[in-house]
């Protein structure tokens, strides 16, 4: 009986969608990179850089704003900005090594993956993680009417804004790649 509630569709599908969004964003980026003629095996490392940058940005924003009644939306946008910044820096490292220095794309990509994972592990031990749950609660906020629709509402509308943003990015990338 306990396993029935754990392995129900209403529990598995929303979690699978939220986890799958991470892979969706990485795959969209890799498809665009491959269309340009490069093979970037360092996408997981770039994603680690971005995630670490997002956590660092949220931590810095919480320290700047203070303990009072912070503007959580500002914290999330600060985290997203740092996430994009760190991901762009990792992409610039990859492009400098492969395009400018003509290094092997496979070797550089795998090295970036290993370095990104190690960088994330190192920096996440330094960051004060006690305040990061505030930003994650706002990112995971559901649409208000999702609970009234039952299981269907949880599966389709029970996700944070970044899930829908990622789906929009994937659809936009599909349209751009298909029509150009």
Question: Model-found features: residue ranges?
Answer:
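Membrane-interface helix caps of multi-pass small-molecule transporters
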Residues: 32, 56, 60, 64, ...
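Juxtamembrane/interfacial segments around transmembrane helices
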Residues: 65-70, 129-143, 160-165, 170
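Alpha-helical transmembrane segments within multi-pass membrane transporters and channels
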Residues: 67-119
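Extracellular/periplasmic helix-loop junction at the C-terminal end of a transmembrane helix
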Residues: 117-154
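Alpha-helical transmembrane segments of multi-pass integral membrane proteins
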Residues: 148-180
